[in-house]
Amino acid sequence: MKKQKFTLLLICISIISNFCWSQNFTQQLRGTIVDRQTKNLLADASVVIKDAKLIAISDSNGKFSFSKIPIAKYDLVISKLGYQNTLINGIELNSGKEVVLEIELEEAVTILKEVTVSSNKNKEQFHNPFALVSTRQFGPQEAVRYAGGFQDPARMALAFAGVSNAGSDDNNEIVIRGNSPRGLLWRLEGIEIPNPNHFTDGQGSTSGIVSMINAYSLAKSDFMTSAFPANFGNGLSGVFDLNFRRGNNQKTEFTGQLSLIGLDFGMEGPIGKSGSSYRVAGRYSTLQLLLNSNIINLNTNNYNPNFRDLNFTVDLPTKKSGIFSLWGLMGNDETYQTTLTEKNIDKGSLNVFGFNHKISFRKVFFKNVLSISYQSQENLKQNMSGGLNGLVTRQLIYKYPSLRFSSALTYKFNNRLTIESGIVLSDLSYNLKDNRLSSKNVLFNYLNDDGSTNFVQLYAQLLAKLSSKIKTTIGLHQYKFLLNDATALEPRWALHMESKWGGIFSTGVGVHSRLEPVSVYLFKRYATNGSFTQPNKNINPGSAFHYVASYEQKINDKTKVKLEAYIQNLTSVPIDTAYNGTYSILNTSGGIPLNVLENAGLGKNKGLELTIEKFYSKNFYYLITASLFDAKYQNKNKIWHNTIYNNSYAGNALIGKEFKLKKNNSISINIRYLLRGGNCYTPINLKESIARSTTILDYTKLNTEQYPDYWRTDLSFSYKKNKNKSTWSYGADIQNVTDRKNIIYTNYDNTNKRINNNYALPRIPIIFMRCEF
């Protein structure tokens, strides 16, 4: 009898399963259409789903909707009389989550009687309308799809031309066109934020081991590598201009993910019936599972990391007063490491909360952002050997509470001319303590300051469409740093020209600079009598003059080839005051220099980049990039040297394919190959190191040596299964799938009297399971 019941149960399960497999699951696709400059809602725009031959017309509120669309990937064509047509490829519908879009249309200079779609706008039309050159728009799809990306925006950017990793694979640090990673600006929701990464690497660092911002939380965002528009200040090498995704304002949805990095959860939905919404996403670290497993061959030296983070948005639209938004990003991390000789405890945290208001009138768009942030870093080191057991060798506490306000006004005179002006006010508070052990085993105080200072930025810029094929921007950015009264006026200009045969020529110039952390300015140097000075308090930010030109040729609507050349001249770079000093801030990614600095250094970067790209369509895409570049710096002795980031060349090949299985299911495979020249370094003088029992570098060969080529292959694959009201994904993202041993630095081993090689991470497989419902 039990056997018969069991057989009957199996038959029922089989019938239900076959029924589920045979269903054609559907989903809703909807969104809002707005003017690109003024954000005014656009009525009577048509949205066509190409393959399905369906059409929707936006209503008086700019909204459109398709109901019960079979789940698949679709291309959309959006058009409106008097506006340029836009084609968006690869919109993916799954049964577990609705797709809600905000589509921006750019007003045409001339109204044509008949308009045809001639370009793919989903990557070329940047989120910022004033960005005309060296900018790439991206969304969560890229960060999730690209192999080795780990759902991290910075790791994803390694696929772009001119971008390479700085060294070890355990950090998402990126080098943009040979510049130091510390020159990168992070912006979120239209305002600057501190470094949004876990396990950061010292003061001024812009990176970490794990990003606090999961790619699934992002809306369309921009990544810039040169000649940024005038509304971007305090960035020298590049800009991540990120935007959070808004929650679904009609339906409550949930997301869960379990991986070897962390446990993720998400929830979003409507607030009442007024069109308001919320979205919240959090993550709790399970990184220790990866380190303790036998999946990777890694000596962790009792390294115990933990992290957690959370981000949210609340969107509150009104009928006449615009849209009010609340948003936040919170994260903290700690590591505990104990060896036979030392105990090391590191703690870091970041909390950012923002309030946005934006409102559109007929020709005006007005946006205000108010944010408050709190960033802290703590480190405690203790000696654990001999008679000095328990002796504190270093104790630091860096705390940065900050208040920022940004206000921008955009005025669109007509379909040819738009201006924008704005102000950014930053109140930068600090509480800094840095105690280090002296040669006499006494803690010496190198930093003990608390207070606040201000950073003021003003800008104005103009966008002029000279014809339907030519547009240009011109702008000015000015800043003043009240801690030492540093000030500068930075001009910006760009030009964009399209040809009738599908070619695009773009060029731009700009002056850019970036402040150092307050701790760099206030660091103390002691004299033998115990008195101290703060010699670096009055150093100015170094300036970079960017010159860039590119030519892009469309092969078809899905494929393009782009060639871009650039020159960057850096002046007033902080360097060591000593004539034969070797320190330049261009060679550092983080940390406080112990040297006395002055603005007497120079730098120069030049390069050529090639991009060949097929946008995602028909379940297939590829991205191939190659870069040749040269990065040099000059110290007080006027001799040009390689920067440590002068890899000479870098390349990337990324390809992906999705295979449809039975109805509603698919398998995706993505492969990425990364190649670059090795970092430059100063060799160790082994003979002198042995004689002195410590590391001695041969500075007569400053940065003349180069490590072997760095290369690795990343692989990701996933299986996606759509059910009636949920979508399940199972897969793995494997970094360095071939287990390549890349040398990242060498050190002198005094015990064995030899030079040792230190390698980047081995094969790292991140297995995950994700559910959306």
Where in the sequence are the language-model features?
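C-terminal beta-signal and adjacent terminal beta-strands/loops
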Residues: 622, 674-694, 710-714, 718-773
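Transmembrane beta-barrel wall of Gram-negative outer-membrane proteins
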Residues: 28, 259-284, 298-334, 345-372, ...
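Gram-negative outer-membrane beta-barrel transporters
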Residues: 465, 469, 567-569, 588-679
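Outer membrane beta-barrel strand-and-loop segments of large Gram-negative receptors
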Residues: 402-404, 446-459, 540, 560-621, ...
